[in-house]
């Protein structure tokens, strides 16, 4: 069976709350670090989430 090219990543809140989302991304088409604006329920507002490796 073929190995998928999508890699699991963690999106960590830049607000410093420790909240994170997990998702996958295609390493071949998007080699740069991902940054998304998503909702952080701890601070109850939308903040920037930055990509980090899943350990």
From Swiss-Prot:
GO terms for cellular component: cytosolic large ribosomal subunit. It comes from Klebsiella pneumoniae subsp. pneumoniae (strain ATCC 700721 / MGH 78578). Keywords: Ribonucleoprotein, Ribosomal protein. GO terms for biological process: translation. Belongs to the bacterial ribosomal protein bL33 family. One of its GO terms (molecular function) is structural constituent of ribosome. InterPro entries: Ribosomal_bL33, Ribosomal_bL33_CS, Ribosomal_bL33_sf, Ribosomal_zn-bd. PANTHER family: 54S RIBOSOMAL PROTEIN L39, MITOCHONDRIAL, LARGE RIBOSOMAL SUBUNIT PROTEIN BL33M. This is Large ribosomal subunit protein bL33. Pfam families: Ribosomal_L33.
């Amino acid at each position: 069976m073929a190995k998928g090219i999508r890699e699991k990543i963690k999106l960590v809140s830049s607000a410093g709350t420790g909240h994170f989302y997990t998702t996958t991304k295609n390493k071949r088409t998007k080699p740069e670090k991902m940054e998304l604006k998503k909702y952080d329920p701890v601070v109850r507002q939308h903040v920037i989430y930055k990509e980090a490796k899943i350990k």
